[in-house]
Amino acid sequence: MPFVRFTESGRSYKPKVSIRVNGTIGFNAGAIRKWKLDGFPFIVLFYDKESRAIGIKPVKVAEEEGSHKLNFGKGKKSAWVSCRKFFDFFDIAVQDTKRFEGQFDEKERMVIVQL
């Protein structure tokens, strides 16, 4: 069996979503790669109160209703969106920064984060 060279860099290849005390949602390099977030400058947020899940839908245009600018760190190895109003509106308490393994829902075309 031939060997395959591993050339990826970054802290983790596993996609992670952080929900931070300051009202931001962050994405690590693994999430940006796996979900191709670097091709989407905006996201739209959704919330399912019954299942306590956040939906994060990447979009290409600012005109999409409810869109938020996705900010990228140096080299696009991290990304974040400021969304304190989202947490306040849905009364989602964020007392500590927490990391989650989001799942991409192909049907809905969005990342689902189960709180």
Feature annotation, model-predicted:
Residues 1-24, 29-115:
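Long, contiguous, secondary-structure-rich segments that constitute the structural scaffold
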